[in-house]
């Protein structure tokens, strides 16, 4: 590994650590971003061999020119990554156009859509909720006749709980269909009565897990967003064997290589006629990037490690170079809302 392009090295702010650790491994880290160089944190500046500023990172022509410049000046580019959901598709397109190793559009496209994920979950032997792609009211009613209320409707290609609806009645269903979503394709799924757990891992070039951990979100992100509730989740001290096994099978089915991933699952809170017995692991969503926000830092505290270095070691050496500590802990995040008055 010699030359590596990191897209948006300045944002999110903690992602500078990926660049710093790559630099410490002797890699030429080449940054592309929309912030002026002088505004970059001094630690980011110190980690970058060179920085190419574009006016608009969504302008593919500008991004293409930036990568072309680095190719001309430094030669073969060995890797390109943002580790950011928003840029995944653009990253893949740039890799294809410049023959850079890593995830390409033909592999990413079916994985990015909620409906496309279902095929891979089936290959992995992990159950998933029944679904249909929303067209008109009659088709939705026919689907609900089969699975019953409530159902969940959300964009087929989306992230988090943006535009996610829990529909409990025909009246709410009609109200949903009356909305204009600007041509966005929605997927409708049966409601899964489960608690959300994640399988977070750094995966090597042969699909081998180099680091495995996970979190528990007792209150779903959908409920937090739609009901304006407080957010809390925690990193598990030790993930359960069945979750680990489901995560590994999904890594194999999705063909994940050389990535930091965040796979979400339900654990059923009650028996379900279609999905299985109470406690069964059910698939929710596959994210081909680290868990959002400062979760990587939480993983560090919980696992006595440095996932930024672990990722950089995977990229550079295809292994973890530091053994870390055997000590494991829980790490809890609690988010409070400005609009609420908290007494205790």
Segment roles from a protein language model:
Residues 1-106, 138, 320:
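ATP-binding N-terminal substructure of ATP-dependent carboxylate-amine bond-forming enzymes
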Residues 11, 15, 87, 165, ...:
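Tryptophan-centric aromatic hotspots in well-structured domains and transmembrane helices
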Residues 62, 139-143, 172:
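Short acidic active-site motifs
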Residues 66-70, 142-143, 176-179:
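CheY-like receiver
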Residues 96-164:
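A conserved helix-loop-beta module that forms one wall/lid of the active-site cleft
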Residues 127-130, 146, 150-153, 162-198, ...:
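Conserved ATP-binding module of the ATP-grasp superfamily
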Residues 190-256, 260-262, 267, 271, ...:
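ATP-dependent carboxylate/phosphate-activation module, predominantly the ATP-grasp catalytic core
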Residues 337-344:
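Glycine-rich active-site loop/lid that clamps phosphate-bearing ligands
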């Amino acid at each position: 590994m010699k030359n590596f392009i990191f897209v948006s090295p300045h944002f999110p702010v903690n992602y500078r650590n990926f660049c710093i650790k790559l630099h410490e491994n002797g890699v030429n880290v080449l940054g592309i971003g929309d912030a002026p160089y002088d505004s970059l944190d001094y630690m980011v500046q110190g980690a970058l061999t060179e920085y190419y500023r574009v006016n608009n990172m969504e302008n593919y022509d500008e991004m293409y020119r930036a990568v072309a410049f680095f190719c001309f000046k430094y030669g073969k580019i060995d890797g390109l990554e943002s580790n950011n959901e928003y840029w995944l598709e653009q990253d893949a397109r740039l890799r294809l156009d410049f023959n850079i190793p890593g995830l390409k559009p033909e592999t990413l496209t079916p994985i990015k859509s909620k409906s496309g994920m279902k095929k891979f979950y089936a290959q992995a032997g992990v159950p998933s909720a029944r679904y249909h792609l929303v067209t008109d009211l009659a088709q939705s009613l026919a689907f609900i006749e089969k699975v019953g209320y409530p159902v969940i409707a959300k964009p087929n290609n989306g992230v988090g709980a943006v535009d996610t609806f829990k529909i409990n009645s025909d009246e709410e269903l009609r109200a949903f269909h009356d909305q204009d979503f600007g041509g966005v394709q929605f997927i409708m799924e049966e409601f899964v009565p489960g608690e959300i757990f994640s399988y977070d891992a750094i995966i090597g070039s042969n699909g081998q897990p180099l680091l495995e951990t996970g979190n528990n979100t007792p209150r779903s992100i959908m409920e937090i967003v739609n009901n304006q509730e407080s957010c809390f989740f925690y990193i598990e001290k030790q993930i359960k064997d069945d979750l680990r096994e489901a995560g590994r099978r999904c890594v194999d089915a999705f063909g994940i290589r050389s990535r930091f991933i965040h796979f979400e699952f339900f654990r059923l809170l009650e028996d379900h006629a279609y999905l299985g017995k109470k406690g069964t692991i059910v698939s929710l969503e596959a994210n081909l990037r680290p868990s959002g926000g400062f979760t990587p830092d939480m993983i560090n505290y919980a696992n006595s490690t440095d996932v930024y270095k672990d990722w950089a070691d995977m990229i550079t050496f295809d292994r973890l170079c530091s053994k870390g500590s055997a000590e494991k802990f829980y790490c809890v995040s609690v988010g409070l809302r400005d609009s609420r008055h908290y007494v205790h």
